[in-house]
Amino acid sequence: MYVETQEEEPEIKIPLPRVGITNLRTIAKINWKGRIYTFIPTFEVTIDLPREKKGIHMSRLVESITDAMSEAVEEEVKKIHTSLEELALAVIKRLEEKHKHKRAEVWIRTTLILEKTTPASRKLSYEPYDVEVAVIKEGKDVKKRLKVRVIGNTACPHAMANNNGKTHIQRAIGELEVMADFNEEIALEDMIEVVESSFSSPTYTLLKTPDENAVVRKMYENPKFVEDVAREILMKAREKFPGRIHVRVISNESIHKHDVIAEAWA
């Protein structure tokens, strides 16, 4: 017989709202509306720990991920998991069978690769986007948080207006987070489009010379402050997505040693 030290009483009886595992990497396949996506996600899984328990059974959290992953990898059952948030909920459901808790959270971080077409040569380019999905279940209440991080660029309108049309350009990073009820259908691709379309211009992995020229022209035709980008993302997101919204845009300034930030909530 093994001693279950986790079930013992701790010396300091204070409840902990989040205890679990983090930075666990694995593999998963998602069937999103008939299209198969393969991910190497990083998981963080936590549950609450009552004041009278010394610890949680960590292996049961890993088992819950492994059980859900087996369904998300095997060819014959890959249609079960239709989104990253559905996969996260599947982990929670398995955890409910293995470990008592009142609140559970599953966070999934990964990279979503989307096919894009370059603006002039119309060549195929594979574009990476950092995404984060979380499902939080407390009692019967289930919420989700979806977050995308998109790289674009901006051209400064102030320098352009005061320098005979010449200006500085820089890479910008836009983050959009939506917090909603679990059953709300929100596509990560739509969130990415909202952010990407709000920059002076998108960026591309592949750019032939005509594409490079097209991107530069678009930037100069569409100068924006980081504030403009943040406002546009927020406006579009409020029109398109239910729930609470958080927008954060950082401009990696090309003529300063510091960066610029704009942030908003709705």
UniProtKB/Swiss-Prot annotation:
This is GTP cyclohydrolase MptA. Binds 1 Fe(2+) ion per subunit. GO terms for molecular function: GTP cyclohydrolase I activity; GTP cyclohydrolase IV activity; iron ion binding. Its cofactor is Fe(2+). Keywords: Hydrolase, Iron, Metal-binding. Gene3D superfamilies: Urate Oxidase. Pathway: Cofactor biosynthesis; 5,6,7,8-tetrahydromethanopterin biosynthesis. Its EC number is 3.5.4.39. The lineage of its organism: Archaea, Methanobacteriati, Methanobacteriota, Thermococci, Thermococcales. Homodimer. The record marks C156 as: May be catalytically important. Belongs to the GTP cyclohydrolase IV family. The keyword Metal-binding applies. Converts GTP to 7,8-dihydro-D-neopterin 2',3'-cyclic phosphate, the first intermediate in the biosynthesis of coenzyme methanopterin.
